[in-house]
């Protein structure tokens, strides 16, 4: 058995073996109970809500798989190291997956996949070992029904990994066996294994119009340079780890729980953002091809930065197409993107960066919020994130595109733009600044200025889209809270400690014009890094999980935040609610469930101080991933609720449709008469705090009679892009609080557009 730091005292192995036996019995029954503690004080539950007890997939026993097998199908063997993992006779651990990424399927089940699978087998230093220790991530489908949870493993369990083999772009090239026997050393380990070159970790998830899900990108792990040999019969495999982005796209079919490969992107992408367009196609932006050493000998001009080329996926034929030079943009990893009501894609000045060290030489451009037009395939700069600076109104909407060094058309245009602006400013500086700053006093707001600019490791939540008096949707608002603020230096995109500052950005659409604005809101109770936001049917935003500081800079040294918070959209303030049971810092996740509750999971930290997985006394738990889930029941679940009886299974833009109400008793009848709004909520597809599909759309109630209501669908397809949604109705209780019903599943259809025939 190989030697490695022991994280669990040997005396616990007997009790863990017994626990594993009973867990196996539960697994064979297919059920694990979801236990909700009793509400001791009803008023407290109505004010703060309640978390269920944690629940998780049981351990399984069996034969440990071949390490070179591409599709590792089960967590196996019966030598438990702790309650999360099982160990074989060689000391290799196989652990239950944590929900680093998850998606709500149309039937209410949860698809999720692991993050950083295999880091538990690092012996000394993650930076030197993960290129060989990490393996492709497992996936699971979780079913929650009648108070029980059960799991199945999709096929293939690792989504098919990288069926075409890795496509690594190494600096060293193929230098193998240069010392000859008996020490056969390979300085490039990018092609020595097939069970770690297609990990789902750091892919993005997006929903397709037909109810399937697509994972875009992922990770190929290797060492560059690295040593892969045997010495005295013992394997030696270490080096400087590299994480390379994949070109792969993989589709999950919920009907048979299977994964299949679809078209490859033109660029490998690690941490990309994917978003559904109005016509059902998918836009992908950013990502990096090589995280640690972003140097590309075949394309030197693209070195030292993230991928600037955007691509569009045609759902009709499964192919990716590059969008052209003017569609390029320098963006952070996992840029916060949203589909606007006019079909443009809004970048909200947020993303991931490896703070405080940065990610690209041009990252100062990440401070500029912008919108991408899929029709013209161009970007328009709208403003400076968090400040009332209207770049689009001052004639500089294409400044960022012109500053892109790979834009061959930029030189003359940039000279002309700068020359014109200089002449105008010299002639009349006040007139030149007027279109940019509509209210100079806003720049004196200290909170706005401190919270302005690029925000790292934060959520960006599109607030409910609401129609105007004519039924048109012309304004979108976005809540940003927590994360880390922009650093002072241009090469430092973020600070170390989490912030509590929050703001709402807005985009108002007036014909072809888009006006950006921003305002500060009440802040979080404390600074929160990596908090996940969930939009509730009531328009409130739940914030869960995270830590007080950046757990990527120095993993394992943060303090987890257990107390959840609720944002009230009417007062624009946060308040504390119930405490979750388990600390969940890095790679946590959450999703709104069909009954209005919220599933919370994840926690897959990097090895402590980039060494091995161990919890430092008093700090965040870092002894491996947490495979458990818990469910938060918001305050509105502890009282009377309206109830939907029937509804359309599918609707088209512009249609009216009826919803039957369930007047099962006097309480339901009373609440049904008080219904004042109905909302369509897109099903969650979340990873690393982002969900490009996230949206809630308020539908006009055109008729409300006893036992039924009639709703009007938007006429704008970009407001409700085709795909799977949940329909909720909201009513006021006796205290005047908005209370949602349980939802009905509904599919929005639309005219799909093909790029390739």
Regions found by a protein language model. Name each.
Residues 21-25:
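Sec/Tat signal peptide C-region and signal peptidase I cleavage site
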Residues 10-19:
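Bacterial N-terminal signal peptides
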Residues 26-410, 414-757:
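Kelch-like beta-propeller repeat domains
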Residues 2-10:
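Bacterial N-terminal signal peptides that target proteins for export
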């Amino acid at each position: 058995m190989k030697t490695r730091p022991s994280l669990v005292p040997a005396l616990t192995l007997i009790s863990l073996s017994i626990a594993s036996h009973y867990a196996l019995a539960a697994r064979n029954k297919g059920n694990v109970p979801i236990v909700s503690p009793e509400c001791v004080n009803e008023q407290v539950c109505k004010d703060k809500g309640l978390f269920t007890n944690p629940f998780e997939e049981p351990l399984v026993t069996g034969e440990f798989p071949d390490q070179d097998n591409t599709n590792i199908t089960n967590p196996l063997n019966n030598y438990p190291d702790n309650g999360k993992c099982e160990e074989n006779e060689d000391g290799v651990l196989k652990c239950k997956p944590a929900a680093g990424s998850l998606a709500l399927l149309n039937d209410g089940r949860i698809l999720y996949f692991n993050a950083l699978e295999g880091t538990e087998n690092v012996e000394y230093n993650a930076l030197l070992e993960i290129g060989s220790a990490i393996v492709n991530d497992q996936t699971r489908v979780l079913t929650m029904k009648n108070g029980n949870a059960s799991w199945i493993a999709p096929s293939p369990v690792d989504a098919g990994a990288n069926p075409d083999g890795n496509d690594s772009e190494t600096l060293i090239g193929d230098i193998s066996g240069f010392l000859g026997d008996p020490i056969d050393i390979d300085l490039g380990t990018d092609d020595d294994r097939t069970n770690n070159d297609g990990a789902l970790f750091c892919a993005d998830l997006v929903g397709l119009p037909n109810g399937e899900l697509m994972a875009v990108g992922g990770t190929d792990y290797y060492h560059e340079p690295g040593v892969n040999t045997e010495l005295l019969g013992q394997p030696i495999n270490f080096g400087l780890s590299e994480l390379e982005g994949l070109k792969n796209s993989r589709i999950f079919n919920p009907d048979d729980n299977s994964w299949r490969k679809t078209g490859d992107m033109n660029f490998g992408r690690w941490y990309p953002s994917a978003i559904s367009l109005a016509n059902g196609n998918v836009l992908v932006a950013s990502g990096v091809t090589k995280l640690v050493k972003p140097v590309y000998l075949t394309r030197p001009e693209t070195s030292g930065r993230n991928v600037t080329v955007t691509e569009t996926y045609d759902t009709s034929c499964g192919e990716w197409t590059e969008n052209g030079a003017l569609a390029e943009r320098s963006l952070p990893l996992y840029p916060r993107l949203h589909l606007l009501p006019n079909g443009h894609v809004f970048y909200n000045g947020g993303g991931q960066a490896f703070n405080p060290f940065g990610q690209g030489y041009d990252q100062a451009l990440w401070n500029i919020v912008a919108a991408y037009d899929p029709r013209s395939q161009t970007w328009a700069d709208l403003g400076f994130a968090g400040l009332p600076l209207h770049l689009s109104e001052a004639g500089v909407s294409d400044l960022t595109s012109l500053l892109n060094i790979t834009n061959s058309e930029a030189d003359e245009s940039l000279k002309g733009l700068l020359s014109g602006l200089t002449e105008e400013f010299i002639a009349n500086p006040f007139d030149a600044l007027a279109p940019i700053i509509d209210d100079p006093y806003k720049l004196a707001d200290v909170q706005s200025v401190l919270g302005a600019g690029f925000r790292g490791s934060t959520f960006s939540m599109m607030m409910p889209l609401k129609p105007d008096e004519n039924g048109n949707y012309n304004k979108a608002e976005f809540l940003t809270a927590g994360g880390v603020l922009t650093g002072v230096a241009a090469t430092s995109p973020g600070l170390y400690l989490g912030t509590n500052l929050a703001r709402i950005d807005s985009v108002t659409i007036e014909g072809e014009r888009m006006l950006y604005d921003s305002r500060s809101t009440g802040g979080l109770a404390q600074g929160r890094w990596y908090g996940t936001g969930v939009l509730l049917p009531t328009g409130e935003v739940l914030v869960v999980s995270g830590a007080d500081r950046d757990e990527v800079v120095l993993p394992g040294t943060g303090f987890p935040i257990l107390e959840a918070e609720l944002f009230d959209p009417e007062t624009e303030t946060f308040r504390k609610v119930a405490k979750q049971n388990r600390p969940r810092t890095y790679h946590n996740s959450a999703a709104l469930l069909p009954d209005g509750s919220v599933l919370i999971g994840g926690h897959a930290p990097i090895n402590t101080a980039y060494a091995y997985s161990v919890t430092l006394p008093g700090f965040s738990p870092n002894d491996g991933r947490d495979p458990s889930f818990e469910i938060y029941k918001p305050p509105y679940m502890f009282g009377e609720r309206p109830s939907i009886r029937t509804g359309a299974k599918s609707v088209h833009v512009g249609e009216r449709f009826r919803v039957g109400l369930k007047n099962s008793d006097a309480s339901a009848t009373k609440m049904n008469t008080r219904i004042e709004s109905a909302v369509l909520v897109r099903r969650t597809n979340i990873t690393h705090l982002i969900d490009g599909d996230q949206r809630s759309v308020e539908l006009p109630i055109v008729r409300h009679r006893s036992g039924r209501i009639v709703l009007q669908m938007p006429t704008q397809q970009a407001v409700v892009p085709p795909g799977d949604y949940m329909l909720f109705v909201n009513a006021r209780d006796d205290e005047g609080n908005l209370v949602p019903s349980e939802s009905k599943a509904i599919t929005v259809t639309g005219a799909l557009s093909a790029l390739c025939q």
